[in-house]
Swiss-Prot record:
Gene3D superfamilies, per the entry: Phospholipase A2 domain
Residues annotated as binding Ca(2+): Y43, G45, G47, D64
Organism: Protobothrops mucrosquamatus
GO molecular function: calcium ion binding; calcium-dependent phospholipase A2 activity; phospholipid binding; toxin activity
Reported function: Snake venom phospholipase A2 (PLA2) that displays edema-inducing activities, exhibits indirect hemolytic activity, and inhibits ADP-induced platelet aggregation. PLA2 catalyzes the calcium-dependent hydrolysis of the 2-acyl groups in 3-sn-phosphoglycerides.
PROSITE patterns xref list: PA2_ASP, PA2_HIS
Coiled coil: none
Catalytic residues as annotated in Swiss-Prot or TrEMBL: H63, D105
Substrates-to-products reaction catalysed: a 1,2-diacyl-sn-glycero-3-phosphocholine + H2O = a 1-acyl-sn-glycero-3-phosphocholine + a fatty acid + H(+)
Subcellular location: Secreted
Record's cofactor remark: Binds 1 Ca(2+) ion.
Record protein name field: Acidic phospholipase A2 2
Disulfide pairings: C42-C131, C44-C60, C59-C111, C65-C138, C66-C104, C73-C97, C91-C102
Length: 138
């Protein structure tokens, strides 16, 4: 119950792109991102440190790095345009910043899909305080 309350509070601050990212993950994987990825291992959700625990956590690490390269953009807030054609995610629009944000999210959603088979339930709701190794470089 405490986790659901925390998720509800966090959602109050979710705007634009993060909600789109949630939808993109849901469409790609069929999983509910808030319960599947929000508190997964060391890099999924807010913040990140230590060594990624598995392939799914590495998807989140790479996504964080991708956002980190977009210094002139607001990746957590900017709304972008995308569509799904067959099973492909297609980023659209004319704004280069928004398109790059979409591409970061697309890569993560596809990464999650490709690693569904190695998703480890033991890392769901993982305490970030256990992520003590040195973080790899992007």
């Amino acid at each position: 119950m405490r986790t659901l309350w925390i998720v509800a509070v966090l959602l109050l601050g979710v705007e634009g792109n993060l909600w789109q990212f949630r939808e993109m993950i849901k469409e790609a994987t069929g999983k509910e991102p808030l319960t599947t990825y929000l508190f997964y291992a060391c890099y999924c959700g807010w913040g990140g440190r230590g060594e990624p625990k598995d392939a799914t956590d590495r998807c989140c690490f790479v996504h964080d790095c991708c956002y980190g390269k977009l210094t002139a953009c607001s990746p957590k807030l900017d709304m972008y345009t995308y569509s799904q054609k067959n099973e492909d995610i297609v980023c659209g629009g004319d704004d280069p910043c928004k398109k790059e944000i979409c591409e970061c999210d697309k890569a993560a959603a596809i990464c999650f899909l490709n690693n569904l088979g190695t998703y480890n339930e033991e890392y769901n709701n993982y305490r970030k305080s256990r992520c003590i190794e040195e973080s790899p470089k992007c």
